[in-house]
């Protein structure tokens, strides 16, 4: 006589089979979900890299005709008079000086050109057209940058989950390295961004951003930002490294400071 009834053994066998099949299907489902999250995160990262280049080009092509029509029909030149006044006056002065010099040379040679006033008038009209085109370009770039910045910010906020997945990949890769390699990568990144040879890069970046938003080149403001912003960023970064890695890996902090010295 069997100590255990066949009904119980069949029930246990069926339960074990169902449990095994459910665990297998659950593992397959988790694998499919992981693959979907990985592909979605990679597509999101690719879009995040491409969009800052594509959006300004497409927006500028659509906005420039509208801005040109608005600028030429509406009496709105006063909006940007202050921004471009010095440049326009400087160009007028250069034209005037050149034609005065030409007239002095002609007088010294005993020749009198009757067309000098016509030439001055033509150059003045050309200068006004250039000034008008510069103002249109400034408005187009300003609107393009503002709309593009708002779009990218919304895209980043809406993709927090995908950014969290990418961040977990980066952290997993970073923490799998040795402390020496971690310190080397941190030192390389900090030297490229805020090292002793980075002020020229900061000057170019700040100048490019200011011009794209319609601000005239100002050497004092650029020098002030270059001399203060990288120092503040370097201090914040060192404090973050000390607070974050001093508890996780004290040896990394020691190696980093040794390599930095």
From Swiss-Prot:
Keywords tagged on the record: Antiport, Chloroplast, Hydrogen ion transport, Ion transport, Membrane, Plastid, Plastid inner membrane, Potassium, Potassium transport, Transmembrane, Transmembrane helix, Transport
Pfam families: CemA (PF03040)
Single GO cellular component term: chloroplast inner membrane
Localization of this protein: Plastid, Chloroplast inner membrane
Catalytic reaction list: K(+)(in) + H(+)(out) = K(+)(out) + H(+)(in)
Keyword match Transmembrane helix: yes
Entry membrane topology: Multi-pass membrane protein
GO terms under biological process: potassium ion transport
GO molecular function: antiporter activity; proton transmembrane transporter activity
Spans traversing the lipid bilayer: 39-59, 138-158, 184-204, 221-241
InterPro entries from the UniProt entry: CemA
Function noted in UniProt: Contributes to K(+)/H(+) antiport activity by supporting proton efflux to control proton extrusion and homeostasis in chloroplasts in a light-dependent manner to modulate photosynthesis. Prevents excessive induction of non-photochemical quenching (NPQ) under continuous-light conditions. Indirectly promotes efficient inorganic carbon uptake into chloroplasts.
Family recorded in the similarity comment: Belongs to the CemA family.
Name of this chain's protein: Potassium/proton antiporter CemA
């Amino acid at each position: 006589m069997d100590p255990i009834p066949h009904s119980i053994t069949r029930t246990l066998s069926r339960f074990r089979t169902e449990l095994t099949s459910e665990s297998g299907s659950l593992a397959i489902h988790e694998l499919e979900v992981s693959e979907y999250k990985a592909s979605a995160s990679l597509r999101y990262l690719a879009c995040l890299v491409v969009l800052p280049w594509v959006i300004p080009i497409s927006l500028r092509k659509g906005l420039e005709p509208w801005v040109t029509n608005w600028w030429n029909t509406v009496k709105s030149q006063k909006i940007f008079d202050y921004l471009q006044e010095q440049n326009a006056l400087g160009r007028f002065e250069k034209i005037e000086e050149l034609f005065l010099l030409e007239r002095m040379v002609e007088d010294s040679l005993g020749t009198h050109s009757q067309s000098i006033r016509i030439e001055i008038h033509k150059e003045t009209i050309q200068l006004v057209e250039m000034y008008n085109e510069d103002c249109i370009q400034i408005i187009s770039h300003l609107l393009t940058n503002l709309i593009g910045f708002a779009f990218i910010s919304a895209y980043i906020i809406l993709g927090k989950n995908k950014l969290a997945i990418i961040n977990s990949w980066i952290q997993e890769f970073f923490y799998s390295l040795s402390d020496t390699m971690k310190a080397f990568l941190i030192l390389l990144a900090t030297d490229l961004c805020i090292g002793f040879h980075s002020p020229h890069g900061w000057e170019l970046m700040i100048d490019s951003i200011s011009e794209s938003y319609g601000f005239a080149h100002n050497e004092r403001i650029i020098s002030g930002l270059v001399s203060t912003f990288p120092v503040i960023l370097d201090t914040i970064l060192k404090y973050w490294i000390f607070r974050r890695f001093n508890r996780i890996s004290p040896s990394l902090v020691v190696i980093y400071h040794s390599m930095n010295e």
